[in-house]
Amino acid sequence: MLTDKENIFVVVTADKLQQDIKQKRGTEKLVFACNGVDYEHYQNIDKDFKFDEKFKKILDQKKPIIGYYGAFASWFDYDMVKYLAKTKQEYNIVLIGTKYDNSLEKSRIEDLENIYFLGTREYKILKNYAAKFDVCTVPFVINDITKATSPLKIFEYMALSKPIVTTAMDECKKYKSIFIANNNQEFVELVEKALKLNRAENLEYFETLRQEALENTWENKARKI
């Protein structure tokens, strides 16, 4: 099907995918457009939202919240997150999302007292939880899957105006607002650095977050396609 250059347009979301498609069928009717964000949706936070009891108890602890939402599968770096939790016991780590396999159970990540797995939350209310994160993360193992991944959530994090720390995925390296960690210790150090950012003293960083979010709205992606 991909070799049908006359009738098939191919849209790719990562450089690695673009390279693979070029080898198979050249550049004809090939469009690059990474993932994007509904900016307005993430700007409209419900300040009166009623959180569940588990999350309210986390908020009541008044500790920094390091957050992630998304899939939990073999590409999630459980060891990195556990290292952060053990090194920085003064942080709470909140994980929200769907289990794609049994990797979360096998990791025993929930054995750590400052790691909280909340399960799934509906898309329309997820933003209210993420708005309470102090730092947003994408701690993925670097492998063939993540080398070709444009994480949707990085643009949502940008729209929420949250400092972002990820592992060294090629698609994440493109953005000035993202702190890139190459190993467990760097992850800890960059989360700590991100926590210290504030609008009064780091206005340029938060403006970069806003601009990169606006550059990657779904409207802009649609125009490109």
Question: What do the predicted segments below correspond to?
Answer:
Residues 63, 97, 103-130:
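Nucleotide-activated donor-binding/catalytic signature segment of Leloir-type glycosyltransferases, i.e.
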Residues 22, 28, 37-57, 62, ...:
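Acidic anion/phosphate-binding donor-loop and adjacent secondary structure
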Residues 199-225:
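A charged, aromatic-enriched C-terminal amphipathic alpha-helix characteristic of glycosyltransferases
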Residues 6-30, 41:
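A short, active-site helix/loop in glycosyltransferases that binds the activated sugar's phosphate group
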Residues 16, 33-36, 45, 133:
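Carbohydrate-associated surface elements
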Residues 124-129, 136-158, 166-177:
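Nucleotide-sugar-dependent
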